[in-house]
């Protein structure tokens, strides 16, 4: 219960950033874009079809920059003061923590175990926490790893809290040896804890190599004759916290779950798993707040739960309007500089409107909001309005909306009325938990429609996020130092392309479903600028077409002897526009501590993913809208550095995180993802070669130096592909891709020259 005294300092404060200089720069770039469009309109009759195509592409780019300017206009974030929480709140609320995994091959069980251990060790009363791991792959190996991790947690959690360890994921913490100034007691405990973690890692590694012996144990009987897409519901209470209030070294509840899957039933991928987590946790612990993290995003800040509670428990007029608290997704490797910059500027910009979007991980949700409440259903004090009480608490309505389970209905009523959760034995809820995991349980209910994580898109995070904001809720953004959660990005290559395609396809699905911001901005409670922010995100896939065309236009104009850019003094519009944008984006990177090399790599990868990966989201969404095929959620392969090298020598955290000699190289395979990029590169190289040997006579009104510079710029941006033409192995472009791209490039050159 929170102390309502207004004389005490606040638990959090909103920080608004007003940088008028950056607003001027954004508007200036927008002005140059509009000037270029106006110039093309005025000279449209004097030029050919190339001019029209360029105008259409630049119109799309101008629209995107208009959206960016709107987003970045009033950035904001929150600063929390978790050290004030204990003196302000006498009884901290419970929190249910969710971890999702789906494939023990692509998501190593030891990585999932480390994420689990980091959550179990956070600085929060153990009797107020419960951790649920959803294993959509129904893997005995994953269960074994987590069961072993729960044993190690009885050593790890007390060690972390005794010495106030900062990094609470063992695989990261043990990368650095203890300082020489540490006490002998600490050094002894450190060695013991490290040895136990190494034993855990070896047991998991041995089980990975030969898991047949797992079938012999009684605890693994439920996993016999199971397949990832065909198995019954499994719910196991791995560890139950029976300690009292104030027992610091206790380990929180830990429950393993795997919902039923059958080949003939839709399971809705991660969104379906999240909704099962909500139901099981509602039956067992029913905490008012829920944290969800991906299996590779460990808790890096021990006070992360307290920081989120500072937002939810702050006494103010709008405290009850906050639906979720989102922490930025940050990474310990060198592959995520671009995302860090994107979150720092655009993320804070969206946070200053109606609140950040839900990013799928590192987010604290309020259970009542996930149960479908609208902002209009609450009184000023956060209690249900009389109309909402009649609407939601009628038993027949609840059964129809939430499913035919008396225990589930009871837990929903308690959650909506904010009743304290009685400390029941978890085993008493096992039968009901099994029931709500059946494939048919959601049939003719509102799960995935208006309740829980929303279906109809593989980007369940964005779909759910706009659904929450459309009901009038706000959200909050906290970016603490050190970062609250850390993970690893897939390296540039097939896995990155796969991930980007999945994101772009899922976002386009939301753009064309009933949650579309094009609908919401006019008839829902979402703010207009928030709708524009979502529109910017959901159109990622659509950008692939104008960007692909614009990468080919300079080459076409050189080969065809046609003008693409303005002539004379008007060329200054393009030169100034390109120069300002480059300097502006470079400043954004360098102001966050990144290098020029990092900035260039980001610019290059942005062009590559847009023209290569995002491009495939277009046919994906077209085929889905036509009912020909359905989009599929493919799990991205997760990797983790090893604490010990093969020779047994330790690697430091710096050695693991910093790029090695191969980290900057782009990886290729024979998939179609790399065909567009190779084609673009070959076309521009051919145009430059043709220009240098005089394939076309360049007369006064045709192409010239500006178009040649455009081709050079495209080649520079696709430098990883140029290097890939001369590399071998996974860093080289396969011959099959090169031959296909070369054939298409020849057709393009013949068409351009002869047209």
UniProtKB/Swiss-Prot annotation:
Membrane topology, as annotated: Multi-pass membrane protein
Catalytic residues, chain numbering: 136, 461
Lineage of producing organism: Eukaryota, Viridiplantae, Streptophyta, Embryophyta, Tracheophyta
InterPro entries: Cellulose_synth (IPR005150), Nucleotide-diphossugar_trans (IPR029044)
Gene3D superfamilies registered for this protein in UniProt: Spore Coat Polysaccharide Biosynthesis Protein SpsA, Chain A
GO MF annotation terms: cellulose synthase (UDP-forming) activity
This protein's name: Cellulose synthase-like protein B3
Species: Arabidopsis thaliana (Mouse-ear cress)
Pfam families: Cellulose_synt
Subcellular location: Golgi apparatus membrane
Function, as annotated: Thought to be a Golgi-localized beta-glycan synthase that polymerize the backbones of noncellulosic polysaccharides (hemicelluloses) of plant cell wall.
EC top class, as a word: transferase
Origin: domain of life: Eukaryota
TM stretches of this protein: 24-44, 51-71, 534-556, 569-589, 615-635, 674-694, 702-722, 733-753
Matches recorded under SUPFAM superfamilies: Nucleotide-diphospho-sugar transferases
GO process terms (BP): cell wall organization; cellulose biosynthetic process
Gene encoding the protein: CSLB3
Keywords, alphabetical: Cell wall biogenesis/degradation, Glycosyltransferase, Golgi apparatus, Membrane, Transferase, Transmembrane, Transmembrane helix
GO CC, any one term: Golgi membrane
Cytoplasm as UniProt keyword: no
